[in-house]
Amino acid sequence: MATTNNKNLTITEKVYVRVRLANEADISHIYKLFYQIHEYHNYTHLYKATESSLCDLLFKANPNPLFYGPSVLLLEVSPTPFENTKKDEKFKPVLKTFDLRATVEDKEAEEFKSKSCGDEKEDVFIAGYAFFYANYSCFYDKAGIYFESLYFRESYRKLGMGSLLFGTVASIAANNGFASVEGIVAVWNKKSYDFYVNMGVEIFDEFRYGKLVGDALQKYADKEKA
């Protein structure tokens, strides 16, 4: 059951979910979701992307085979079933129904209304994303998947959807011959830490994450090219 009022969405009892591969029509939503995760971590001052630069990164300038270049899966929700979902030629969408223990109040529904349903449904809204790409390590003889980030808008957290989205990425890795799924886990976020452990992720405490960026990186630039 669902109601809409002043661009807000209220869902009770059941919510229908679809995980699909993002495309160029989704770029404005991806940009907003990426900004929101920077807000969550208090890193908005580091967010340099634009819709145009993201579109180039994810689609126009991405010549890599499927899932080897920067890839985004979107998790969409609807108060009504996805009955006539068209199959993406690259990736078969994953469908699931969630029984709600509490009412979902989405005050951003209109802003995140899906523009790329492919099945003429008007009541589809983007709830979250997974961003990942291939990585390589001398520990393995084939590529792995680097899981860059998983994010849900506040209205759709703690509903079990994270397990579906991360599990879909893990399934992609297992079914396409990747060696691993790897990423960074924030040790300060116990809920996130416990989530990944419960999903089967092994945490290596003896390693620390390092980054060379900004002015520190530019010190290595070829001065003759300046």
Swiss-Prot record:
Q: Does the keyword Acyltransferase apply?
A: yes
Q: What is this protein called?
A: Tyramine N-feruloyltransferase 4/11
- Decide whether keyword Transmembrane helix is in the record: no
Domain of life from the UniProt record: Eukaryota
Record-level GO cellular component terms: cytoplasm
- Give start and end of each N-acetyltransferase domain: 72-222
Site Important for catalytic activity: give positions.
Answer: 157, 160, 162
Name its species: Nicotiana tabacum (Common tobacco)
**Location of region: Important in binding site and for catalytic activity:** 29-45
Q: Which UniProt keywords apply?
A: Acyltransferase, Cytoplasm, Transferase
Quaternary context: Homodimer.
Compartmental location: Cytoplasm
Q: Which reaction does it catalyse?
A: tyramine + (E)-feruloyl-CoA = N-[(E)-feruloyl]tyramine + CoA + H(+)
Q: Pfam families from the entry?
A: Acetyltransf_1 (PF00583)
Main site of residence? Answer: cytoplasm
The EC category is transferase
EC code(s) of this entry: 2.3.1.110
What are this entry's molecular-function GO terms?
A: tyramine N-feruloyltransferase activity
* Family listed: Belongs to the acetyltransferase family.
Listed InterPro entries? Acyl_CoA_acyltransferase, Diverse_Substrate_AcTransf, GNAT_dom
- How is the activity of this protein regulated? Inhibited by (2-hydroxyphenyl)amino sulfinyl acetic acid 1,1-dimethylethyl ester, by DEPC and by N-ethylmaleimide.
Q: What job does the chain carry out?
A: Synthesizes amides which are involved in stress response in the cell wall. Catalyzes the synthesis of hydroxycinnamic acid amides from hydroxycinnamoyl-CoA thioesters and various hydroxyphenylethylamines such as 4-coumaroyl-CoA and sinapoyl-CoA.
